[in-house]
Amino acid sequence: MERVLIIGGGVSGLATAYFLSRYAIPSTIVEKSWRTGGLIKTDLTDGCQLEAGPDSYIATKPAVTELTQELPGLRDQIIGSNDAARRIFVVRDGKLQAMPQGMVMMVPGDWDALKKSSVVSAQAKRAIHRETKWKPLERKEDISVGQLVEEHFDAEVLEYLTEPLLCGVYGGESERLSAESVLPRFMGYERKYGSLVKGVRQELHDKPRAGSLFLSLRDGMQTLTNSLAAAGAGRANVVRGEVIAVKQDGRQWQVRVGKEMLTAGSVVLCCPAHVNAQLLAASVPSVANELAAIPYSSAILVMMVYDQAALGHSTDGFGFLVPRGERKTIAAATWVNTKFPSRIRPGLAALRAFIVSHRAVELAEATEAEIVALVQDDYKRLMGITAQPLFHTFHRWPNSMPQYVVGHAQRVTSLFQQLTEYPGLFLAGNAYDGVGIPDCVRRARDIAQHICEKSV
């Protein structure tokens, strides 16, 4: 059976190799880094598991959980977040305010909790109540998340309830992000009920929440990519090197890695869209142009570990979110010792700062020491922390977060339609139809199945 070339050894590439191996289809992974796993990386320091990339995945998307049931050693690894302490705070006027319990994005699932909350004003609460009068609406074109929320509620709900949550996932601005691609569930509510509040109420009635919202792995998220590497990529040939170009040669695809030329019947590109665009620029310019049009945001992660007794502030909750208007360095902070207590040694507190969007761009040339100092200043102002951390870890992820801007779904549809003209060329990763790890695994599974069906 013809070998498949997989470009990129992150979770998408490793998952593709694994699913291909289930069909006995040989593959070769080309990875320029010294390690596989991509953005998934677990640092083990002084008895603590510190995630350099994603720390969990959403429980409502089953692809990763299903995968753990078949990978050796992972069946008993799944752990849930400590949802008994699932309190999230939002910074308003320089102070941490508890977000109302039961929120589903910007929509309240618990009216009493909303009434008691000081995150939004009485005027915003009235706007949320008025929204229940909306009638079903079928839009003819995509709109931004900002437009959707302001039309249904108001600017305050957008600033303090919506944007901070989205920023932690997409690292982008609401006025640019696509409502259809980022909030498809809510667009569905608008079409069916008109009111987003009515849609959430009905969903909570039909499918009450059960279990943890976030899932992870007991020994760290890197356990997933390590297991994939051993189970699937372990049967694949791994080539270390940087891909220069990809081009079609009759029914074959040629991949130049340094001075070497590799040939295969199928190529799966698992790199960021802008990297894929460079690889295809000379040979498939129409596809390359669509890929190059997908913008990206950068991220910086700073993990600080403190002596809990010296912290001087409670970490009873999952952490806090910082709206843009508060003008802080960090966009979000996770209190890891509460969200996943087993990851942090007893007596310690771990604060995970997330810097994204324009702030990450502004700090692109800043040193690690300068950024750490800015994060500490935010903690001092918001939490009153004056103690020095026992240690910290620091990671930059430049151009790592694809932005699903207005019109993204149409662009992806056009992109995939063009791919049908190039048999054997596939795109995997988080730039197309889902940014989470489960989305990457699902897409890898579907590509492997398609290659198998075409090879029969």
What are these regions (language model features)?
Residues 12, 35, 274:
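Conserved Rossmann-like nucleotide-cofactor binding loop
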Residues 46-136:
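Dinucleotide-binding Rossmann-like beta1-alpha1 core, especially the glycine-rich loop
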Residues 60, 151-152, 270-271:
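Short, well-ordered coil/turn residues at beta-beta hairpins
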Residues 100-102, 315-317, 332-456:
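Conserved flavin/dinucleotide-binding core of flavoenzymes
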